[in-house]
Amino acid sequence: KISGHFIQGHVDTTAKIRKINLTDKSWILRLELEDKKLKKFLVEKASISINGVSLTISKVTNDYFEIYVIPHTLKLTNLRYLNINNKVNVELDILCKYIYKYSN
């Protein structure tokens, strides 16, 4: 059985943290991709890796995307040290990239 997120460890681009909201101990991170051409690979509910941490995209707009970070993930990863305007490494969902490649 194959399950979970597919993360390879290959950084596709960076993103800048534009906003951090705290809700019930979870964080909502609003990020802006450095390479705008890669926005086509951002899909709500798709996987994304931020600084090597596999997460799920919760919202995508023309200008930014958002992810939720639960307390357990904050406690165990480097994400708890992030601040607004920090740059983070981004690995996009490999399945989104493959589907895009083979459908075009």
List the predicted regions and their residue ranges.
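Conserved loop->alpha-helix
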Residues: 1-104
